[in-house]
Amino acid sequence: MSKIIAINAGSSSLKFQLFEMPSETVLTKGLVERIGLEDSIFTITVDGEKQKEITNIPDHAVAVNMLLKKLTENGIVKSLDEIGGIGHRVVHGGEKFADSVLITDEVLADIEELSDLAPLHNPANVVGIKAFQEVLPNVPAVAVFDTAFHQTMPESAFLYSLPYEYYEKFGIRKYGFHGTSHKYVTERAAELLGRPLESLSLLSCHLGNGASIAAVEGGKSIDTSMGFTPLAGVTMGTRSGNIDPALIPYIMEKTGQTVEEVVSVLNKKSGMLGLTGYSSDLRDIIAKEEEGDHRAKVALDVFVSRIHKYIGSYTARMKGVDAIIFTAGVGENSAIIRERVLEGLEYMGVYFDAKRNNVFGEEAFINFPHSPVKIIVIPTDEEVMIARDVLRLGNID
């Protein structure tokens, strides 16, 4: 049995989960927030109870030291020697990484080089990796990439209709994201269906504040809604999803904003927040719609219609689907959104059961037994996928 830590480092945060492997038992989990500020927050779960501490955590190295100290202080591990491996979520692996990989100096340099493709995320991921290297230099560490799962997409899916040299020189293409989540839920769907993954055509709907749809055929991603960046695809909490690119210079001309300012609006002030004017949270928006708010209704209609575009397109690409999967915050917990997405899809063999659909955050089939297309709610577990890859690649006993 080995203890493995799964790490997700943000620019001012560090999310962690400690597993006993291969049993996949969660020993503890927690979050360090507001790193670099005087009122940093350290939260850890010990024996089912959350412990919260507000203190000064100036950087990720201090956060890592504090985390490891808490593990020994609380008896979660007797000594740090029990930690057999560390798994780091890395947002962008470009074309270089089609699978998770053991971190070497060369790999770390490659991840840093890819930072121009994910300037908000990769630098923070690198900081997290280096912070653990300082404290646990001899423990195997593995990088698990959000983009890796989608590296099986064919050229017809990943190329943009731009001068081909842009792809050759600058790597401009669709990469796709949420890959670890899409991989987990499609593998789990095959288990629940009792069929080999290789025989299945699946639609994976990862619906959270960030959202993406993936077409997975034979266990391989053949297309996905996010693109060169996580800004593309369906309407999201604060992100616009796909728009006419000519809108960017038009908005600049009309508002006097710079390119960076317009892109910031598309990332942080658009989507459901932009359409409603008051919230990116679908729970708030659904409540407002029930009160008769027109913009809430329109925003929800837009959200669902954009998802339908991908369901229709990907069903055609795969010549039919065996199952539709709902995951992530909204997909797992919003029966209303699932119902609206599924309504009217009888033409493609989708028959959902409103009673069975009344589930929140748990695995469930929500289709009628006679439905040719199965509909499954599967809570995602990116952390366990990270831990599995550490076990697979780290030569851990």
From Swiss-Prot:
Its EC number is 2.7.2.1. Its cofactor is Mg(2+); Mn(2+). The keyword Metal-binding applies. Disulfide bonds: none annotated. Pathway: Metabolic intermediate biosynthesis; acetyl-CoA biosynthesis; acetyl-CoA from acetate: step 1/2. The record marks H178, R239 as: Transition state stabilizer. Transmembrane segments: none annotated. The active site is at D146 (proton donor/acceptor). Keywords: ATP-binding, Cytoplasm, Kinase, Magnesium, Metal-binding, Nucleotide-binding, Transferase. Gene3D superfamilies: 3.30.420.40. It is found in: Cytoplasm. It catalyses: acetate + ATP = acetyl phosphate + ADP. ATP binds at K15, H206, L207, G208, N209, G210, D281, L282, R283, G329, V330, G331, E332, N333. Pfam families: Acetate_kinase. Substrate binds at R89. Catalyzes the formation of acetyl phosphate from acetate and ATP. Can also catalyze the reverse reaction. NCBIfam families: ackA. Belongs to the acetokinase family. Homodimer. This is Acetate kinase. It comes from Bacillus thuringiensis subsp. konkukian (strain 97-27). The lineage of its organism: Bacteria, Bacillati, Bacillota, Bacilli, Bacillales. The gene is ackA.
